[in-house]
């Protein structure tokens, strides 16, 4: 399986609490709910396409509990996202037991989750997908194990909050595999990581790379 990270994000790189102001107030974040006023049919199509590649979900505990509090109530058999989240295999990175809601489809990964993720990647299938789970996504990004990055980029600046990229991650040059613009100006991006390429300059007859 390939490992993909799938996130809603703002222009200033924030992925915290896209749905509602109360969704995630950690760190004193008060500007949640920034995505929903702009979420349109094109956004829904993009998310449905993300889930069309899913073989299993890899979630942090916060996101797992948030999903468990919402998605079991969505019972429309034609809802691809709900069907995958409710019925598909889920791996959650946590040090404590999970509830009974999805007990039959959930496997708990402990502190050695990076080794377990590498094992899961070696298995046949589509994608092992991370949704939300910012701290988990950060750890996977820093470890250099992400194969695909997908973003639904909202034309919003919130001025603070948690996001995927920090100053301690690898330098990458991304290759665009797909991009679409929705009716409300959101951009759905699919990117694959590659070796960082900096600009070059000729100094004293020698080419220097930055």
Label each residue range with its predicted role:
Residues 1-148, 155-210:
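Portal/gating segments that form or line small-molecule/metal binding sites
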């Amino acid at each position: 399986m390939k490992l993909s990270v799938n996130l809603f994000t703002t222009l200033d790189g924030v992925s915290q609490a896209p749905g509602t102001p109360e969704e995630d107030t950690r760190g004193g974040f008060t500007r949640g709910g920034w995505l929903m006023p702009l979420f349109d049919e094109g956004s829904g199509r993009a998310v449905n396409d993300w889930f069309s590649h899913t073989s299993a979900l890899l979630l942090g505990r916060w996101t797992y509990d948030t999903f468990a509090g919402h998605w079991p109530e969505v019972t429309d058999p034609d809802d691809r996202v709900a069907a995958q989240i409710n019925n598909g295999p889920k791996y959650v990175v946590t040090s404590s037991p999970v509830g009974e809601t999805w007990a039959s489809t959930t496997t708990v990964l402990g502190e050695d989750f990076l080794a377990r993720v590498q094992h899961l990647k070696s298995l046949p299938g589509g994608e092992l997908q991370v949704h939300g789970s910012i701290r988990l996504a950060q750890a996977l990004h820093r470890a250099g194990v992400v194969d695909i990055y997908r973003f639904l980029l909202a034309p919003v600046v919130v001025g603070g909050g948690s996001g995927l990229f920090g100053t301690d991650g690898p330098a990458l040059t991304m290759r665009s595999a797909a991009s679409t613009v929705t009716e409300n100006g959101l951009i759905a991006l699919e990117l694959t990581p590659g070796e960082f390429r900096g600009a070059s300059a000729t100094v004293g007859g020698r080419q220097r790379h930055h």
